[in-house]
Amino acid sequence: MADEQNLDAQAQDQAAEAGAGDELTTRVQVLEEQLAAAQDQSLRVAADLQNVRRRAEQDVEKAHKFALEKFAGDLLPIIDSLERGLDLSNPDDESIRPMREGIELTLKMFQDTLKRYQLEAIDPHGQPFSADQHQAMAMQESADVEPNTVLKVFQKGYQLNGRLLRPAMVVVSKAPSPATPSINEQA
């Protein structure tokens, strides 16, 4: 009987060890899953942090690049006025020649300064119309050029660092309409 009790005790011990082994295996699996989830979350947080840093750097870069946008926009009417003044003055009139030369020099210095800050004029005369950079003020029939070609520029457009600041206001060509026959030709 003592042997049976020893066998029962050994069986119980083995069963307890097997149960404890199953518990340990289950516990190890749970801990491994938690570890994997924590590592995954850590990677996601690191990736999010890197994305936030990259976006912040891009925002700062854009802020530096386009900080002059409002100021440059306020300068455009001044450039327009100087150009209009030159266009309206007679280059052959000796009485205004010194003033005209002064305006020309001022305008050139102004344009050179703006170019240094990547503010560039859009003067599309003779180019195909582009809705991205031009604003059509009128359409005019023309057999001399292809349809949708800029015939006249009312006001130059400007770009700052490649971004449109003001579209060019233009007259765009269209194909001539077919001549309508007169009443005599129809008969």
Swiss-Prot record:
The keyword Cytoplasm is annotated on this UniProt entry: yes
Pfam families per UniProt: GrpE
Location relative to the cell: Cytoplasm
Location of the region described as Disordered in the Swiss-Prot/TrEMBL record: 1-22
Keywords: Chaperone, Cytoplasm, Stress response
SUPFAM superfamilies from the UniProt entry: Coiled-coil domain of nucleotide exchange factor GrpE (SSF58014), Head domain of nucleotide exchange factor GrpE (SSF51064)
BP terms from Gene Ontology: protein folding
Biased composition regions of type Low complexity, renumbered to the chain: 7-22
GO molecular function: adenyl-nucleotide exchange factor activity; protein homodimerization activity; protein-folding chaperone binding; unfolded protein binding
Coiled coil: none
Claim: Cytoplasm is one of the keywords in the record: yes
Top-level taxon: Bacteria
GO cellular-component term (any): cytosol
Record function comment: Participates actively in the response to hyperosmotic and heat shock by preventing the aggregation of stress-denatured proteins, in association with DnaK and GrpE. It is the nucleotide exchange factor for DnaK and may function as a thermosensor. Unfolded proteins bind initially to DnaJ; upon interaction with the DnaJ-bound protein, DnaK hydrolyzes its bound ATP, resulting in the formation of a stable complex. GrpE releases ADP from DnaK; ATP binding to DnaK triggers the release of the substrate protein, thus completing the reaction cycle.
Subunit-level organization: Homodimer.
Family of this protein: Belongs to the GrpE family.
Protein name as catalogued: Protein GrpE
Provenance organism: Pseudomonas syringae pv. tomato (strain ATCC BAA-871 / DC3000)
Lineage: Bacteria, Pseudomonadati, Pseudomonadota, Gammaproteobacteria, Pseudomonadales
Gene that produces this protein: grpE
